[in-house]
Structures are given as structure tokens and as C-alpha cells.
């Protein structure tokens, strides 16, 4: 049986992330895991059609990361206060790429993440972070769409 000593819960701070917390906490408790909660703050380098002077970009990115940390701390305090959270972290970058990188750097054993279940044009326009993580991660990824419940 695989051991999941470190579980990563990447969040986008939406209600979708909050909805899957029972799955995340159940897995963390079942395997007595250290839970890493990660928010990736999308930065300007990924908006290549907008021109903003470099100094403004650095200031903006610092504010985005600081604001993300504040919101993530609130999210954890509200939703995960009774669980085994060991790391709460905000990093700048592209969410899909940074989640996969975090898995490798931190030695994560399992990723548990939400999926919005977008289809068609929405998926083409917005992409799928979950799909990228599932197809490129070196560890198992459990995806949960909280809006698709068993009947």
C-alpha cells in the first residue's frame, strides 16, 4: 500500500476549493499526512498582451503575493483549523506549472485538488489546471468536482 506522508492541496481560494475540504481532510487523517496548502498567484508574465513598465510589474506582483497570503491564511483558519496543516504557502507563477514543480521540490506523495469540470469553449479559453497537473505530475492526483455528486 502506498504511503502518502505529504499531501498537497492546491487551492484557488474559490468556493470550489472549500467544497472539497472533506475529501482533503479525510485523506490527510487516514494517512496521518502532513498537509501542504498552496495558492499560486498568477503573475503578469503570463499576460503577454498587456504592456506595463517593469517597476510597476514588480510592485504589483508583490502586492498580489501579499494579498494571496492574507486570503490563504484566512481560508486555512476558516476551513482547515482542525486538520493537520503543516505548510501554508503562496508562490507566484502559472498555477499548473508551479503545482507540478512544488510536487517535485517538496517531495509530495499525493495531490488532492478540485476541478471545475469545464467543457467545450470554457475549457479552451480558460485551460485546465487540473488536467495539466494530472497529465504531468510524477505522483498520483485525486481530482474532485464537488458539483458532480453521486445520485
Map each language-model feature to its residues.
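Phosphate- and divalent-cation-binding pockets in alpha/beta enzyme and binding domains
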Residues: 19, 98, 120
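Gly/Ser-rich helix-loop-strand patches that form or flank binding pockets
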Residues: 101-151
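Structural beta-alpha unit
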Residues: 1-2, 30, 76-111, 148-151
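Hydrophobic alpha-helical membrane-association signature
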Residues: 20, 68-71, 129
